[in-house]
C-alpha cells in the first residue's frame, strides 16, 4: 500500500514557456527562491526543464504546470499537465 503511494508522489512545477520550436516539446523556466545559509537573504534562481507537449498547445509566454514522469528522451523528464494562463 505505501509503495504505491510513494510511487505516485511526483514533482509538479509551475513556470513560463520560453521555447516551443521543437515538435511536441516545450522549454519551461521555473523560478524558485533559496535562502543564503549565513545571511538568510533570499536569492532567486531559475532552472529550465524540457517537457512533453503532445498536442503542441503551449506557446511562448504561457504559464504552464508540468509534472515529473518517466524519461521520455535524453533530456525530457516532464510532461505538460495544463496551461494556467495564456500569453497575450
Curated annotation (Swiss-Prot):
CDD domains linked: Ribosomal_uS17
GO MF entries: rRNA binding; structural constituent of ribosome
Alphabetical UniProt keywords: Ribonucleoprotein, Ribosomal protein, RNA-binding, rRNA-binding
GO CC list: cytosolic small ribosomal subunit
Protein's GO biological process: translation
Coiled-coil regions listed: none
Pfam families (alphabetical): Ribosomal_S17
Presence of the UniProt keyword Transferase in the record: no
Taxonomic superkingdom: Bacteria
Keyword Ribosomal protein: yes
Function: One of the primary rRNA binding proteins, it binds specifically to the 5'-end of 16S ribosomal RNA.
Subunit structure: Part of the 30S ribosomal subunit.
Family, per entry: Belongs to the universal ribosomal protein uS17 family.
Protein name: Small ribosomal subunit protein uS17
Organism placement in taxonomy: Bacteria, Bacillati, Bacillota, Bacilli, Lactobacillales
Amino acid at each position: 500500500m505505501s509503495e504505491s503511494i510513494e510511487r505516485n508522489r511526483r514533482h509538479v512545477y509551475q513556470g513560463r514557456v520560453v521555447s516551443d520550436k521543437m515538435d511536441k516539446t516545450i522549454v519551461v523556466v521555473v523560478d524558485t527562491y533559496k535562502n543564503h545559509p549565513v545571511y538568510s537573504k533570499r536569492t532567486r534562481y531559475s532552472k529550465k526543464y524540457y517537457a512533453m507537449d503532445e498536442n503542441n498547445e503551449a506557446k511562448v509566454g504561457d504559464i504552464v504546470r508540468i509534472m515529473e514522469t518517466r524519461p521520455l528522451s535524453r533530456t525530457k523528464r516532464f510532461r505538460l499537465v495544463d496551461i494556467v494562463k495564456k500569453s497575450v
